[in-house]
Amino acid sequence: MSIVLHGVAAGKGIAIGHAHLITRGTAEVPQYDIDPDKLDAEVARFDNAIKATRKELEQLRGAIPENAPTELGAFISLHLMLLTDVTLSREPIDILREQKINAEWALKLQSDKLAAQFDSIDDDYLRERKQDMLQVVRRIHNNLVGQSNEINLAGNLLDDTVLIAHDLSPADTVLFKEQHITAFVTDAGGPTSHTAILGRSLDIPSVIGLHNARKLITENEIVIVDGINGVLIIDPDEVVLNEYRRLAREYRSHKRELNKIKKTAATTADGINIELLANIESAEDIKALHNFGADGVGLFRSEFLYLNRDSMPTEDEQYEVYAGIVKKLKGKNITIRTVDLGVDKNPRWFGQNSTPNGSLNPALGLTGIRLCLAEPVMFRTQMRAILRAAAHGPVRMMWPMITSISEVRQCLIHLDTAQRQLTERGETFGPVSIGCMIEIPSAAMTVGSILKLVDFVSIGTNDLIQYLLSVDRGDDSVSHLYQPGHPAVLKTLQHIIRTANRMEKGVSICGEMAGDTVFTRLLLGMGLRRFSMNPNNLLSVKNIILHSHTGHLENDAAKILRCEDPEKAEKLIKILNQSEQAESQAV
């Protein structure tokens, strides 16, 4: 009997193959006391495990094939950075000595503490980094107990092998190039987890976040991985198999056609130019940006320069990163978002003004621009680095989590101070356009006042939807209430877009809605002309744009915006995408 499981679509595509179960699970953690005179030996054992883990990761990074996606090396580098952080390399030793316990148990106590801290982070992407931390912990643990860190792919794998695992690390995926891996599914992972990102980057059909797939699948069982809709079908019947074989052929044909429009300008059927930008978090992502023909960078997440370290990154260190990216863009625009962190994410080097106060809801506490304003030295240091990078090409600076015009005014004062400091030092710096992230309802409602002070706004739909609907999409019990097509969300977006257009100020969306083709035509009809997304979604969105007529879509959008019922709005959006005009977009 067939079983259908629903998860998160990661790598797009459809695959039919034989399941190969990766049985590596959660390791049993021993717990025992250590005699005081043996504590030094236990510390040495832990240090040796750290060294062995570092050697493994460095060897893996050196073994990455040249044609592998840049994200693979970036994630292994992230694991190395996490390994060297004191929270994993030194603090377990403090626990070991204080409680006189074995290294494995001390490591577990510390990882449980860190996992709870990650769970309290509001930002989806940063919260998902918990899995990276846990994978590093697993490597350390395995080296402590003498277990292998490699997944078992022994035996003769079939040409259509589908890996079934609890989770896959970046290091695991290095093996994909050497093995017959058609697709993979995991029980763990969310939309912004490294597993999802690597699935997209490796261009392998994949579905993650299935929870119990491994318990329901037997070795070599036939499975269908639908990486388009996030569906796994176990033991399908012949009718379903034939239908998915047809869908797989259609998808491959569709993909070949999409590759033909990489260098085509994103212009609608009625001649409206649309700007398609990429969201990135490292210099390594520039390759993907160029590969998919992005017009520039709509969001550079700068906070990764600040994570997992004991001191704030220096101005010169930040300048080198920003300037390097600006130069690689060769004249294309980049929007750098100033650091979007909370005290719950990395409190070790924050000043007294931002000491954690035990807030039960860090998302509503000292986060985003509030933290920047509480740490003016950090804020001005970053802005000086961005200003200096702007001497090498067009740069926009964007402030996160703005709630009011008073915050914007304070930011402008700090910007003026940063510019004056550079002038006094005789440093060369360039002009920057200034903008704000609109991701808080208060900012959305007062966007007109905010736009009087800045050049552009970018809508962070991920957080805006969560705040508007009071729902945490990372919580499985309420995630179904996260509805981008909810009338309250659509009316809020329309207000922001219409206000910015009327004031002739720039407006974009940089949340997931920008890369979701379900909403492309609706957003065009609402007047959006700048989309910023994961580079992997650019061609699919461009294809819809090329076949869209904005004049027709404006009428359709107006009808949808008059809806008051979420279900009716969703139905009308589906009708919009299934209309004759939408059908003409099919490649």
Write out the residue ranges for each language-model feature.
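Conserved alpha/beta-domain cores
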Residues: 255-587
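Non-catalytic, soluble scaffold/interaction modules
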Residues: 1-328, 334-341, 375, 382-383, ...
